[in-house]
């Protein structure tokens, strides 16, 4: 479903950390089953986009590695600077071979001509390009400045400490480069619906997420025709996998869903399958 049929609009922000209402416990049963199948921790939360009310949650306040899901927050910070007149999406950034890190399918093709800030955000979100993320991090002042931006939004949980690809290390009990499902869901909701960004910037962020090209095996694989999804996946060491999404029927999003898992010995295909099955249960019991 094209984003042309959906436009973001301001929605008053209410505290999302209310008591959960387990309207469809079948999905939580599937989340717990995924833990058993993967031999790993799984964190899950589902928020109503309009009210911020928690609809379902499992391990919502346990820390998980962010992996590449942080790239949405990063581009939110970039757009905030654009709104403040401190950055321009059309500004071209030049870089060298020495700047390239592993998994940079877009930036490696533009060594001669460079890329605009807009193009870098698109590459970071739609293709999860790691060099694009590092170049964007440089424009805002590095990982600590992204953490400071999140603090300014009221998120004192989510933190970025390192650059790509080291931030994907996912060492157990290491709080670096981590978030909690509840914190991530609330922050994503603020970026997409709150007053932090202008309407144009909110629309741009969700456009990039809707155009995600690397999350096909996850929630997208369970979506019926006509549903809307804008998402960003992540993968890391020690069996870590994650996805953050805004989705809903009738071509527009109505819920925020965040799923993280870490500590599994399972293959990537199996991790993808378990997340897709959680998505299938979510949709079945919508």
Regions from the PLM with identified roles:
Residues 10-20:
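Bacterial N-terminal signal peptides
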Residues 1-11:
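Bacterial N-terminal signal peptides that target proteins for export
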Residues 100-135, 143:
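Conserved catalytic neighborhood of penicillin-recognizing serine enzymes
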Residues 35-64, 87:
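Short, conserved catalytic-motif segment at the N-terminal edge
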Residues 52, 64-93, 257:
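Active-site SXXK
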Residues 41, 116, 134-193:
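Mid-domain, small-residue-enriched loop/turn segments at the edges of structured enzyme/sensor domains
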Residues 24-36, 50, 55, 138-139, ...:
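Structured C-terminal helix/loop/strand segments within mature extracytoplasmic catalytic/sensor domains
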Residues 80-99, 147, 198-201:
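Short, well-structured active-site flanking segments
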């Amino acid at each position: 479903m094209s984003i042309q049929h959906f436009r973001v609009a301001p929605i008053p922000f209410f505290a999302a950390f209310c008591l959960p209402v387990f309207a469809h416990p079948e999905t939580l049963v599937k989340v717990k089953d995924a833990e058993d199948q993967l031999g790993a921790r799984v964190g899950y939360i589902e928020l109503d986009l309009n009210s911020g009310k928690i609809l379902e949650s499992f391990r919502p306040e346990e820390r998980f590695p962010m992996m590449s899901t942080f790239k949405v927050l990063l581009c939110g910070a970039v757009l905030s600077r654009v709104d403040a007149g401190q950055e321009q999406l059309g500004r071209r950034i030049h870089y060298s071979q020495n700047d390239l890190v592993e998994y940079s399918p877009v930036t490696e093709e533009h060594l001669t001509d460079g890329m605009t800030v807009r193009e870098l955000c698109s590459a970071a979100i739609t293709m999860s390009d790691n060099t694009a993320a590092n170049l964007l991090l440089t424009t805002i002042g590095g990982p600590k400045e992204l953490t400071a931006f999140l603090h300014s939004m009221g998120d004192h949980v989510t933190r970025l400490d390192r650059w790509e690809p080291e931030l994907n290390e996912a060492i157990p009990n290491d709080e670096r480069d981590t978030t909690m499902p509840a914190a991530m869901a609330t922050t994503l909701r603020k970026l997409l619906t709150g007053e932090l960004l202008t309407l144009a910037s909110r629309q741009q962020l969700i456009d990039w997420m809707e155009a995600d090209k690397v999350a096909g095996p996850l929630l997208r694989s369970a979506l019926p025709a006509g549903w809307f999804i804008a998402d960003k996946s992540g993968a890391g060491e020690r069996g870590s996998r994650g996805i953050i999404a805004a989705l809903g029927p009738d071509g527009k999003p109505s819920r925020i869903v965040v799923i993280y898992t870490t500590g599994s010995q399972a293959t990537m295909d199996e991790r993808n399958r378990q997340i897709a099955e959680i998505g299938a249960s979510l949709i079945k019991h919508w």
